[in-house]
Structure formats: C-alpha cells, structure tokens
A protein has these predicted regions:
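Non-catalytic, mobile gating and regulatory segments of ester bond hydrolases
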Residues: 1-125, 129-261
Length: 261
C-alpha cells in the first residue's frame, strides 16, 4: 500500500520510524529495517557530517534526514549557527540548517531527478536537526524545475527554521509533531524573528494528541514537568527523545489513548 493511501496516524508513525532509523550507521541493519517497512532501495548520503537516507519502492521515495548527534561537532555547530541568512526562496533561514542542506542537496537532487518516475511520490521527514534539514529540502523542491514538489513533510521535535517571510513561501504540507515540553521546539527564539512552519500536532503530558488552548497547554506543560521530576528526568530533554514520539504515535495509530487524559 502506498503512503498516500495511509491514514494520517499511520503516516505519522511510519515517518517517525524512518526518522529514527536515519540515526543508524549500520547499512545492513538499516536495509533490514527499511525492508520491514516496505522499502526495497536504501541510499545513504554523508558529506562533512551532514547525513540523510533515501528510502524507496515502486510507489514512494522518502528522504529522511539525520538529527543532531552529540558526538558530531558539525551537528552541534549547525545547531548553534542561528544567525539568519538569505534563503533560496524569500526572506531568511537559519544559517546552520541551510549549511547542512547545502552539503547534501546536490547529491539528493541528482538521485531524485534520476530515480523518481511519474508514479513515484516524494516525501521528507526528520527529527531535531534532521527535521530542520527536511524542511529546507522540501522547500527547495518547489524551486527546482527538474523534480516534482514533495507530497508532504513530517517532522518531530523540529526547531524553528526561518523568518515569517520564509515560512510563507513553504508550499509543502507540513505535519509538525511536538511532544509536550520538547525543548528543541522552542529554539531559535521567536524574539529574534524565527517562526514555526506547518500544522502542529501536539502530544500532551500523557502522550495523547490534543489541540489545547494556550491556558490548557500551559497547565499541561507544568504537569509534564512535574511528571518528569517524579521520574527523575528533565522533561524538556526526555520529551525530545524519538523513542517517546514513536511510542505515543503507535498508540495514536492504533486509535488508543492513555486513560489518564
């Protein structure tokens, strides 16, 4: 079954798993995991610390960008380079995120142009830094005459990527998942001009999908912080874990909820 025929919960879980797999360096394991999810072709991109995978079958092509690795200096440097620079479209984008994509884009663009046929659909996903990279890549598709536009973009724990003018140019449908107090979703700060893109899907302190008011969200964040303290965890960091995103999205895909809320 093609991705476009899946429900939103099913797609959200699939892309979360692919975004998680993108952290794996063992190509043999990655191919095995990808096959279990229905993908027959796997390609790894790696240049100057910027990394992504291409997962492909007869119907779909997915670019999954790898997120921040604490042991990789380039990843940390990319996160810290928050100064905005001119984008390919309009307004300004995060300097570090753009630089990471600049490293990989020629290879990714060449492969997409070469391998995508009229029956293939193009998708992007990523977690953390990978979410930001996937956002920048998806936005570039609209300005490339040689390839089709991306179907949709799925991100998990994404930082803000660009200024409002940049966000307005985004043509790809963006499903942006946020887990309660995930600290990465709060940076770079809006005070220096950055804005989130896409439709937010919020997971509350119990891992259930909600659309809270500002007041409800404030209370839910306090609840999450208190629950983290009781577990001996820093909630802002544990909520960024891809494991938690996947666990909650598995419940969502099954139509289940945590009974506490």
């Amino acid at each position: 079954m093609g991705i476009s025929k899946m429900t939103l919960p099913e797609r959200s879980l699939l892309f979360a798993k692919l975004a998680s797999i993108a952290y794996n360096d063992n190509i043999k394991e990655v191919k095995k995991q990808a096959k279990s999810l229905g993908f027959t072709t796997v390609e790894f991109y790696n240049k100057e610390g910027a990394q992504a995978y291409r997962f492909q079958n007869k119907e779909d092509l997915v670019i999954a960008c790898r997120g921040t690795e604490p042991t990789q200096f380039n990843d940390i440097a990319a996160d810290l380079k928050a100064a905005p620079v001119k984008s390919e479209s309009a307004s300004r984008v995060h300097r570090g995120f753009k630089a990471e994509v600049d490293e990989l884009w020629p290879m990714v663009l060449e492969d997409i142009t070469r391998t995508v046929n009229k029956d293939n659909k193009l998708w992007f996903c990523g977690h953390s830094l990978g979410a930001a990279m996937a956002t920048v890549m998806a936005s570039r598709c609209f300005y490339e005459d040689s390839i089709r536009d991306a179907e949709e973009l799925y991100t998990y724990g994404s930082p803000r990527v660009g200024w409002p003018g940049y966000v307005k140019t985004m043509q790809t449908k963006h499903h942006r998942w946020v887990n309660n107090n995930d600290i990465v979703t709060t940076v770079p700060p809006w005070l220096i001009g950055y804005k989130h893109d896409g439709e937010e899907h919020y997971l509350n302190a119990y891992g259930n999908v909600r659309k809270p008011t500002r007041w409800q969200r404030f209370k839910d964040k306090l609840r999450g912080l208190w629950m983290g303290i009781k577990r001996g965890q820093v909630d802002s960091f544990s909520d960024h874990s891809m494991v938690n995103y996947i666990n909650y999205l598995e419940m969502y895909a099954k139509g289940k909820e945590n009974s506490q809320s």
